[in-house]
Regions:
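Signature for HUH/AEP ssDNA processing cores
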Residues: 35-95
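Histidine-centered divalent-metal-coordination microenvironment in nucleic-acid enzymes
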Residues: 90-113
């Protein structure tokens, strides 16, 4: 994603985003997030969106690349596929004052197969723990429920034929656009990606 333009309005591509003049988001990243959200909503009668945070052990020295998260996301996608769960994954790297980055990941899942994010978080925590050589009990992956519009307080569910489908679509776009915020990416090393997205299958 070579071009990065700031977006400061509360809507983009006819969907709600969490942005204003003091809290811009990257337009290109937000658009990629929305593409994956719309793809899943068009494909499945129900879509469940969760939010996971990946961190490193405080004593671990991290490199100026995204090798660990890239490996983990690839393995997480494979795990979900083996479990029969269709999903698109979005991740963002953040690093402001800390010596270590942390990552936000939004799994956009077939809501007929995923009822709450804890199951997905468990898969991801096991994979991340192996990737960073940590104990799964350390829980360096945790889920972050939305403040509002939560389904069982763990994520956002969009039911295609539900009376609140359009509202929940906007809620999900607004929630996920947090990953595209400009703030807290100041220490991203030059040449290091800030975002990652699983590929949408070609029609």
């Amino acid at each position: 994603m070579p071009k990065r333009h700031h977006h400061t309005e509360s809507r983009l591509n006819n969907l709600s985003v969490n942005a204003d003049p003091e809290h811009p988001v990257y337009r290109e990243a937000t658009t990629e997030i929305q593409k994956r959200l719309r793809y899943m909503v068009d494909k499945h009668s129900q879509v469940f969106v969760g939010h996971l945070e990946f961190r490193f052990p405080p004593e671990m020295e991290t490199q100026n690349n995204n090798r660990h998260i890239s490996n983990a996301i690839r393995k997480c996608r494979m795990k979900l596929k083996r479990e029969g769960i269709d999903a698109q994954l979005v991740w963002a790297r953040e690093q402001r004052n800390s010596d270590q980055p942390h990552y936000h990941c939004y799994p956009i899942c077939d809501g007929n197969k995923v009822q709450h994010v804890q199951r997905v978080a468990g898969f991801f925590n096991e994979i991340w723990s192996r990737e960073i050589d940590a104990s799964p009990e350390s829980n360096y992956v945790r889920y972050c429920p939305p403040q509002e519009q939560a389904d069982s307080n763990t994520g956002i569910r969009i039911r295609r034929h539900g009376s609140d489908a359009e509202t929940q679509l906007h809620n999900a776009s607004h929630w996920m656009s947090y990953a595209a915020k400009v703030n807290e990416k100041e220490k991203t090393p030059e040449g290091c990606r800030m975002f990652g997205f699983t590929q949408i299958p070609k029609a």
